[in-house]
């Protein structure tokens, strides 16, 4: 089974929420899966949630090798702490997790092009990992543009898009929420893996599992 990256159209669109649902569902299906958060800024809550969804014996440092205290993009946060995002440390941690698990779900930081260092964006790191990418779309006004831009950027990196998960970030639905999915389907060839209502605590894994094998 292949490892993969979870990225989003923006920050706060539900990357951690979807990543945790996937890890939990894979493990319930008998697959030894773990989450991985290469970089966290501000706090480590995302890593804690991934640990709750996955193997409980992993430390936060194993799940999240780079933690920066300022809640901003990794490049700025690292500069404020007079340090840098050490991608070699990240790769070693990823390799260790990958060797011990059947599937590693790599949750990105911020959006696809967020800066992580001088001349380096998250998309550069993703390209180095050479993993397929799952895109989480926060289903709200403006999502179509953000989704198509991100899908095109993933293609430009030569990476496979595993598919799309629409995450309804609010209880209330407006016209955009109702029509975003059909527009993204019309203007892209990425498969829709699922659509989550606000607060949903499970995810149908059938389509994703087919694409991971």
UniProtKB/Swiss-Prot annotation:
Q: Which cysteines are joined by disulfide bonds?
A: none
* Binding residue positions for ATP: 12-17, 46, 107-110, 167-168
Q: Where in the cell is it found?
A: Cytoplasm
Which pathway does the database say it acts in? Cofactor biosynthesis; biotin biosynthesis; biotin from 7,8-diaminononanoate: step 1/2
Q: Name any one GO molecular function.
A: dethiobiotin synthase activity
Q: Which GO terms describe its biological process?
A: biotin biosynthetic process
Please name the top-level EC class of this enzyme: ligase
Q: What is its EC number?
A: 6.3.3.3
Recorded catalytic reaction(s): these are:
(7R,8S)-7,8-diammoniononanoate + CO2 + ATP = (4R,5S)-dethiobiotin + ADP + phosphate + 3 H(+)
Chief place where the protein resides: cytoplasm
Top-rank taxon of the source lineage equals Bacteria
Question: Which key words are in the record?
Answer: ATP-binding, Biotin biosynthesis, Cytoplasm, Ligase, Magnesium, Metal-binding, Nucleotide-binding
Q: Name one GO cellular component term.
A: cytosol
Q: Which cofactor does it need?
A: Mg(2+)
- Record InterPro entries: DTB_synth_BioD, P-loop_NTPase
State the family it belongs to.
Answer: Belongs to the dethiobiotin synthetase family.
Complexes and interactors:
Homodimer.
Function as written in the Swiss-Prot or TrEMBL entry: Catalyzes a mechanistically unusual reaction, the ATP-dependent insertion of CO2 between the N7 and N8 nitrogen atoms of 7,8-diaminopelargonic acid (DAPA, also called 7,8-diammoniononanoate) to form a ureido ring.
Q: Which HAMAP family match?
A: BioD (MF_00336)
User: What is the protein name stated in its UniProt record?
Assistant: ATP-dependent dethiobiotin synthetase BioD
Q: Which gene encodes it?
A: bioD
């Amino acid at each position: 089974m292949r490892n993969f990256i979870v990225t989003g159209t923006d920050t706060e669109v539900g990357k951690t929420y979807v990543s945790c649902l996937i890890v939990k569902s894979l493990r319930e299906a008998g697959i030894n899966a773990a989450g991985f958060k290469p970089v966290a800024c501000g706090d480590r809550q995302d890593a804690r949630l991934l640990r709750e969804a996955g193997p409980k014996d992993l430390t936060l440092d194993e799940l999240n090798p780079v933690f920066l205290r300022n809640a901003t993009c990794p490049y700025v946060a690292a500069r404020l702490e007079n340090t840098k995002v050490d991608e070699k440390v990240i790769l070693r941690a990823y390799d260790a997790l990958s060797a011990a698990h059947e599937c590693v779900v790599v949750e990105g930081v911020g959006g696809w092009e967020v800066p992580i260092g001088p001349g380096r964006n998250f998309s550069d790191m993703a390209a180095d990992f050479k993993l397929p990418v799952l895109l989480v779309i926060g289903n709200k006004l403006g999502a179509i543009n953000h989704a198509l831009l991100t899908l095109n950027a993933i293609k430009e990196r030569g990476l496979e898009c595993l598919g799309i998960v629409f995450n309804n970030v609010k209880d209330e639905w407006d016209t955009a929420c109702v029509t975003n999915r059909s527009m993204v389907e019309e203007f892209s060839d990425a498969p829709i893996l699922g659509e989550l209502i606000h607060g949903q605590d499970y995810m149908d894994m059938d389509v994703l599992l087919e694409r991971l094998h």
